[in-house]
A protein has these predicted regions:
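Extended, compositionally biased low-complexity polar/Lys-Gly-rich tracts
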Residues: 59-63, 94-99, 107-111, 167, ...
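Alpha-helical transmembrane segments
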Residues: 4-15, 240-243
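Surface-exposed intrinsically disordered loops and tails
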Residues: 77-88, 121-176, 189-198
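Membrane-proximal loop-to-helix boundary features in eukaryotic membrane proteins
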Residues: 216-240
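Juxtamembrane interface at the cytosolic side of transmembrane helices
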Residues: 2, 234-278
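Feature for secretory/organellar precursors and membrane-associated catalytic proteins
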Residues: 8-12, 18-141
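Extended, hydrophilic extramembrane loops/domains of integral membrane proteins
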Residues: 169-225
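Short amphipathic alpha-helical surface micro-motifs
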Residues: 17-22, 91-94, 157-162, 182-192
Length: 278
């Protein structure tokens, strides 16, 4: 085995070791049997014109962790709460949770915005509003421990949305999160006011919590599906091709660099041998 082949083999082994290590880390950290989910829609994108690292885009694979695992590490926080603690995930404040989406056949992966406790008498309490510096209002009461009627927020999330929901419209009086997708165009309001779900997302409704993204890791799977192929935007597929080309370029540079070293070593050897050639 020549030197160039050895370097290539070492590079491949390092890559495989990195992938294996990441897989093991994900398995241990997630505490789930199925720790990956492919994003099939654009509801969490921050821009509809291009893909971004650190943001959940169409075709990304998302690494999941169990609710108990995330809670034990303090990694389940609403947007309102996280504004006060500084906790951020996927380009904004608060946690991104995965929950069963009512009539939707796929689970929903959206951001938790605020937790509401049901008081049992037709009112709701939101303790995280105690130190919230943003603008909010409620038609039934300005007491955050006895909310009723229409709850509204002004200029929230990275998209600067104005959102609201009628607390009296919920079909289940259960404590839980109000949720919303990050997309500034397609997800302009709470899920609970967008025909996605009709009640707060309680702990029993949450399947898992998003931990990290694998950019464009699910594009090939979506391209093979008749149901979701149209969701893969051109820029997302181009981003995957760019990533593949990057790996090819790196390996090519390693290969040609080593070939140059081998050639240089061979020429030096010939030069030394020629000194003894009479």
């Amino acid at each position: 085995m020549n030197a160039s082949t050895k370097i290539l083999v070492v590079a491949i082994c390092v890559l495989l070791a990195a992938v294996g290590g990441l897989t093991l880390y994900v398995k241990v950290s997630s505490d789930l049997d199925s720790s990956l989910s492919v994003v099939t829609s654009n509801s969490m994108q921050h821009d509809n014109s291009y893909s971004q690292l650190g943001v959940i885009d169409t075709g990304d694979a998302v690494v999941l962790q169990s609710v108990s695992q995330a809670a034990s590490k303090g990694q389940i926080q609403s947007y309102v709460e996280a504004l006060q603690t500084g906790y951020q995930t996927f380009g904004d404040y608060g946690s991104v949770i995965i929950y069963e989406g009512g009539s939707s056949k796929n689970p929903i992966i959206h951001r938790a915005i605020i937790w509401l406790d049901y008081n049992g008498n037709g009112t709701w309490s939101a303790p995280s509003l105690a130190n919230y510096k943003g603008e909010w209002s409620c038609t039934g009461s300005s007491d955050y421990m006895r909310l009723s009627g229409k709850l509204s927020f002004t200029d929230i999330t990275q998209s600067h949305k104005d959102v609201s929901v009628d607390l009296n419209s919920f079909t289940r009086n259960q404590s839980g999160f109000l949720t919303m997708g990050d997309n500034p165009t397609t997800n302009r309001n709470f899920d609970q006011n967008s025909h996605i779900i009709t009640y707060p997302i309680g702990w029993d409704n949450i399947r898992s919590v998003a931990m990290m993204e694998i950019p464009w890791g699910g594009i090939v799977k979506l391209m093979m599906s008749d149901d979701y192929r149209h969701n893969v935007m051109e820029h997302s597929f181009n981003s995957l091709l760019s990533l593949i080309m990057l790996f090819v370029t790196v390996f090519s540079l390693i290969w040609f660099s080593d070939m140059h070293i081998v050639k240089k070593s061979y020429m030096k050897k010939l030069e030394e041998e020629s000194k003894w050639d009479f």
